[in-house]
Amino acid sequence: MKYIISVLIISIASVAYGQEDLPAGNDQFMKRQFEHTATAFKMLSYDRVAWVSSDSIQTLSKEELSTYGGQWFCYLDSAGRYHALYGAYDSTYTLTAHYLVDSASFAVNRTFGQFDTTLAVHYSKAYDLALARKNEFLGPEDRLRYNHFIFRSDTSIKVHFLPAFQPNGYMIYGAELHYTLSSDASEIIDTLEYFNEYRGYQSMPNKTISIVYEDLDYIPVGAVFFLLYYERQFKSIRIVTKDYVTTLIRGKDNEPSWFHVVRTPPKKKKKKKSNP
């Protein structure tokens, strides 16, 4: 289908650096775009902490690793450091290893210092509740690998699940699950579960690809994360939603901006009446 093109370019540098100002006159689409971009940037840092700290945990002794029950998460403290915690949860949190990760350089150092034990319990409970709901939604036959991201605010804990990079080299999109829990993780208070179908690509640096969400009138968090996380694997990535085609452009100093093309179907031409 051909479309009349209307272009809107929005800088996302302010989002990347944690500012929350929205462009004047923005509509609901743009508002959600800025919110989801901010979340995706936090996910990128969370994922980086996972990578650098997981390398360190491989160096632990067999005795130490025997206490690891699969509960891993990280949180950012008031000093701007990430705490990556690996352990097990069974009504209480048992720590296997605790790493401090610099939020700028992502340098990793193991620490035997204190950590937020209450938060560790709440994060573990939140993860277990959200994981159970995710598995119920996707069903027992689903075997796709997912990454999880856990964030907190003063009033809630949010657990996000996005498809991970798969062992067969495919980068997958088409499903994402987001759960908001009470601050003590005693219950799920809001749910956003999206599944269309799993679709994906392998790395093609010279090809422009499209990730398609034509059933949505907004750009989901998973689409933003996919573009930011895998942008070097392709020439360009386009996000196609109901009303927009969106991509990322970079200006001076590699500053990113969203490039939105409004999808407006052209008016059909009236057929000329033939003379009798």
Show where each model-derived region lies.
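Bacterial Sec-dependent N-terminal signal peptides
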Residues: 1-25
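Start-of-domain marker
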Residues: 19-82
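Exposed beta-strand-loop-beta-strand "reactive/processing" segments of non-cytosolic proteins
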Residues: 59-98, 134-175
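Hydrophobic alpha-helical segments and helix pairs
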Residues: 85-135
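Short helix-loop boundary/capping segments
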Residues: 164-200
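Short HxH-centered metal-ligating active-site micro-motif
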Residues: 186-221
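Hydrophilic extracytoplasmic domains
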Residues: 217-276
